[in-house]
Amino acid sequence: MALLQISEPGMAPAPHQRRLAVGIDLGTTNSLVAAVRNSVPEVLPDEAGRALLPSVVRYLEKGGRRIGHEAKEQAATDPRNTIVSVKRFMGRGKAEVEGAANAPYEFIDAPGMVQIRTIDGVKSPVEVSAEILATLRYRAEDTLGDELVGAVITVPAYFDEAQRQATKDAARLAGLNVLRLLNEPTAAAIAYGLDNAAEGLYAVYDLGGGTFDLSILKLTKGVFEVLAAGGDSALGGDDFDHLLFGHVLAQAGIDAKALAPEDVRLLLDRVRVLKEALSSAPQASLDVTLSNGTRLVQTISHDTFASLVEPLVQRTLTPTRKALRDAQVTPADIKGVVLVGGATRMPVIRDAVAKYFGQPPLVNLDPDQVVALGAAIQADLLAGNRGGGDDWLLLDVIPLSLGVETMGGLVEKIIPRNSTIPIARAQEFTTFKDGQTAMAIHVVQGERELVADCRSLARFELRGIPPMTAGAARIRVTYQVDADGLLSVFAREQHSGVEASVVVKPSYGLADDDIAKMLEDSFKTAEIDMRARALREAQVEAQRMIEATQAALAADGELLDDAERTQVDALVAALRTIAQGDDADAIETATKALADGTDEFAARRMDKSIKRALSGRRLDEI
């Protein structure tokens, strides 16, 4: 009789008792999902074994779409409907979107946040991001075998309130419960700190496809304290691509405005390949033919590239110096520099970091995966899956100051930048006029002194103030930032007790009604999505069956007579043909036919294996 096993007290819960939570790195160029499995964080690949999901969504007629690799492959042939680098547009108006001039999209300057016209209608960056997040959610649930209780989603440390709220709304649209929005450098520090039991001061240099962050962290016995954060939410690997794109066109004497959208996307894709090639070679070549027949052939040396992008490299060092000053440390005080983001693979970046900090950066974890791995560890903790002795404390900070408008359009800072979160701060204000019975509270974010130079987050009114002489009323305004970096503001008149409050949802044009409509639209297209998903799953299973059968025939084909071999070959050929179509039921039927048709062959192979294993052995040896 088999003995049942009972785990030791304090051991990890059984799989069916674990609450499934994941970490998601929603990136500009690529996105990933990771989970803790058997106490080890690991990135979850797709059915083809690919860890990275290109952050690309292609919209088709009648509600269809392609996401990830399939969409990326069609970007050059259908650029207007294939959205790439959407993270750069999150929470941003058209005027704020850098690189928009080279983008082949038809932008619509909606209130607060830019939108994009596609063949399937106008799409907001939130909707596009939701498609990517939903794909990662499905991948995780398929791999882990159950529904998720939630996810930790990483955001650039320098994302402002509007961008953070947009990310949270995208997750909501994707059907994800957000356990925490975690700053990307902090996630990387978790992965490194727990893996290496590191202590001391560390800098996390995070250069992704569309954003740059630099955080200074102090790691001490399970405490991750962010001392300072700086960055640029509109600087990333895409900018290096656009600079090289402009150089190639200038060398050829071509005006970018004269290019067709298809040529813009094609050339940007080829330029990115060229940039990546220069990371491992002294020079690389570009050979591309445009839609009008013009052929561009150029060879770029690494030295030329390094000289070209030097201004961008220096742009990353400016917030680096600022963060060090804010943390009151010098480069010599830094024990290690962690590189995060695919763009940090460029030698010009690694050389600049090594020169500035006086030491080679840490690169023993994949810069593309380290953020997702750290997020997975944090998600596992928040889901309650880690033991009591396996806790750690995150002390993150807000990247930009939060303030209120005062008379004259001035900003009074309530919570200064680099304040540890969660946090609550209060300040008292008074009335400006005699008999004033209401006060307008205007919440802003930024480091400038004038409201016009800062980002407006929210407005609300406190009414019912007792009429008094100017300066007699006392209004206490409290700012409260939660662990996700999201803000609530409360105002209370001290004499009468009248109150007003607002949970800040930045005015980027996405109200609850908009989200409800998007959810309704997603329900309408759910059937299309499920059909596409079923088709893809059937095609993958068919390909697996074909490859397994061919391998078996190559190894043991002699076990079949000519008639049997002909029948199996016919079934394989039929399945291969049907799998190229779009009828999932037909593919499943053909796959089952091949499985049934090779049952006898499989049995003979099993007999052969058993005979070979037993050959030459005595009965008492078995």
From Swiss-Prot:
<dbReference type="InterPro" id="IPR043129">
    <property type="entry name" value="ATPase_NBD"/>
</dbReference>
<dbReference type="GO" id="GO:0005524">
    <property type="term" value="F:ATP binding"/>
</dbReference>
<keyword id="KW-0547">Nucleotide-binding</keyword>
<dbReference type="GO" id="GO:0016887">
    <property type="term" value="F:ATP hydrolysis activity"/>
</dbReference>
<protein>
    <recommendedName>
        <fullName>Chaperone protein HscA homolog</fullName>
    </recommendedName>
</protein>
<dbReference type="InterPro" id="IPR010236">
    <property type="entry name" value="ISC_FeS_clus_asmbl_HscA"/>
</dbReference>
<dbReference type="InterPro" id="IPR042039">
    <property type="entry name" value="HscA_NBD"/>
</dbReference>
<dbReference type="Pfam" id="PF00012">
    <property type="entry name" value="HSP70"/>
</dbReference>
<keyword id="KW-0143">Chaperone</keyword>
<dbReference type="GO" id="GO:0016226">
    <property type="term" value="P:iron-sulfur cluster assembly"/>
</dbReference>
<dbReference type="InterPro" id="IPR013126">
    <property type="entry name" value="Hsp_70_fam"/>
</dbReference>
<comment type="function">
    <text>Chaperone involved in the maturation of iron-sulfur cluster-containing proteins. Has a low intrinsic ATPase activity which is markedly stimulated by HscB.</text>
</comment>
<dbReference type="InterPro" id="IPR029048">
    <property type="entry name" value="HSP70_C_sf"/>
</dbReference>
<comment type="similarity">
    <text>Belongs to the heat shock protein 70 family.</text>
</comment>
<keyword id="KW-0067">ATP-binding</keyword>
<dbReference type="GO" id="GO:0051082">
    <property type="term" value="F:unfolded protein binding"/>
</dbReference>
<dbReference type="InterPro" id="IPR029047">
    <property type="entry name" value="HSP70_peptide-bd_sf"/>
</dbReference>
<dbReference type="GO" id="GO:0140662">
    <property type="term" value="F:ATP-dependent protein folding chaperone"/>
</dbReference>
<dbReference type="InterPro" id="IPR018181">
    <property type="entry name" value="Heat_shock_70_CS"/>
</dbReference>
